[in-house]
């Protein structure tokens, strides 16, 4: 159903990712950016408050009619849970406690994971570092869709289905592209999450558990905030691999929209990324950028030139230095 996309292959490139050279050039010109590379302890209190708000919402929905459970899971819970996944993104970069307390950050990530209902924070950390070091690398960067996704989701309707099912593909893709041995922290993450889910069921009931899980599923699928999944690296303009978004939803997402800035300086917490853009404005103002994630979702589904194949892909090579 719907017209078929024109792209039938990834955009293969044989050059290094652009962030390495730009980082080096910007730091040579603006060494003061190094002062922005520091922990953000405010994340500890913000994330804890988000956890408590979701805990309160579990109590508030426990006796609602099912239609209102689903309604509030999409309208409210989805925003909170998607925001929490991006808090986990901040934690994966060790921003709450700093790099010298990396283990504290891993435990805090497990804590932040609890309202989402599905364990993933420890695994996300492992794969996300690969995404930065080997951006677009075949068989390493699991942010790149599989060949099956590009081949099958090739019509307007199928692309819409793909957007709705994004959380499923993000969960399963690592198993097919770059499987890794399970670590003890991943086991702890899983066991802790299962225990919390059981507690939610027995204390609040099935409606609260469904609310929590639906909030994650809906919030990571066809949802305005989910536009960032596509906006960050899908090639809407040939030759451009990473795109920033400067709209208001950055307020809910720890500035993940500042994505060129983030990949240029992954050791700068989200709070300081607008300062990076301000300091080095001549570098970022000229790059392609978005002001609406909703429009990104619409264009992805409706534009026949865009599909899951619209990613720049490169053969695997040596690791990039992120310092």
UniProtKB/Swiss-Prot annotation:
According to its UniProt entry, one GO biological process term is:
fatty acid biosynthetic process
Q: Where are the transmembrane segments?
A: 41-61, 68-88, 102-122, 152-172, 184-204, 217-237
Motif position, Histidine box-1: 89-93
For this chain the motif Histidine box-2 maps to 128-132
Q: Where is this motif: Histidine box-3?
A: 259-263
A cellular-component GO term for this protein: endoplasmic reticulum membrane
Q: Known catalysed reaction(s)? A: an N-acylsphinganine + 2 Fe(II)-[cytochrome b5] + O2 + 2 H(+) = an N-acylsphing-4-enine + 2 Fe(III)-[cytochrome b5] + 2 H2O; all-trans-retinol = 11-cis-retinol; all-trans-retinol = 9-cis-retinol; all-trans-retinol = 13-cis-retinol
Q: Which UniProt keywords apply?
A: Endoplasmic reticulum, Fatty acid biosynthesis, Fatty acid metabolism, Isomerase, Lipid biosynthesis, Lipid metabolism, Lipoprotein, Membrane, Mitochondrion, Myristate, Oxidoreductase, Phosphoprotein, Transmembrane, Transmembrane helix
Q: Which GO molecular-function terms appear in the entry?
A: cis-trans isomerase activity; retinol isomerase activity; sphingolipid delta-4 desaturase activity
- Alphabetized SMART domains for the sequence: Lipid_DES (SM01269)
Q: Which Pfam families match?
A: FA_desaturase, Lipid_DES
Sites of Phosphoserine modification: 307
Subunit structure of this chain's protein: Interacts with RLBP1; the interaction increases synthesis of chromophore-precursors by DEGS1.
Q: Give the family from UniProt.
A: Belongs to the fatty acid desaturase type 1 family. DEGS subfamily.
- The protein depicted here goes by the name Sphingolipid delta(4)-desaturase DES1
Source species of the chain? Alexandromys fortis
């Amino acid at each position: 159903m719907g017209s078929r996309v024109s792209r039938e292959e990834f955009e293969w490139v044989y050059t290094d990712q652009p962030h390495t050279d730009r980082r080096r050039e910007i730091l040579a010109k603006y060494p003061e950016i190094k002062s922005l590379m520091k922990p953000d302890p405010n994340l500890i209190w913000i994330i804890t408050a988000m956890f408590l708000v979701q805990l309160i919402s579990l109590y508030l929905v426990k006796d609602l009619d099912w239609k209102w459970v689903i309604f509030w899971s999409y309208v409210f819970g989805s925003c909170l849970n998607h925001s929490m996944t991006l808090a986990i993104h901040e934690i994966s970069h060790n921003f709450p406690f700093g790099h010298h307390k990396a283990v504290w950050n891993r435990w805090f990530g497990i804590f932040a994971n609890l309202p989402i209902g599905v364990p993933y924070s420890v695994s996300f950390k492992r794969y996300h570092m690969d995404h930065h070091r080997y951006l677009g690398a075949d068989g390493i960067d699991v942010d790149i869709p599989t060949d099956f996704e590009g081949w099958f989701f090739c019509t307007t309707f199928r692309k819409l289905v793909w957007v709705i099912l994004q959380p499923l593909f993000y969960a399963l893709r690592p198993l097919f592209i770059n499987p890794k041995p399970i670590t003890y922290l991943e086991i702890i993450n899983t066991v802790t999450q299962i225990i919390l889910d059981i507690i939610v069921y027995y204390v609040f009931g099935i409606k609260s558990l469904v609310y929590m899980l639906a909030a994650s599923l809906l919030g990571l699928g066809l949802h305005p905030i989910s536009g960032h999944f596509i906006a960050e690296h899908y090639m809407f303009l040939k030759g451009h691999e990473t795109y920033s978004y400067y709209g208001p939803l950055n307020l809910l997402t720890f500035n993940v929209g500042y994505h060129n800035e983030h990949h240029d300086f992954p050791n700068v917490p989200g709070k300081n990324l607008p300062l990076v853009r301000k300091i080095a404005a001549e570098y970022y103002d000229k790059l392609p950028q978005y002001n609406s994630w909703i429009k990104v979702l619409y264009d992805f589904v409706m534009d026949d030139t865009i599909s899951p194949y619209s990613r720049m892909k490169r053969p695997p090579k040596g690791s990039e230095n992120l310092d």
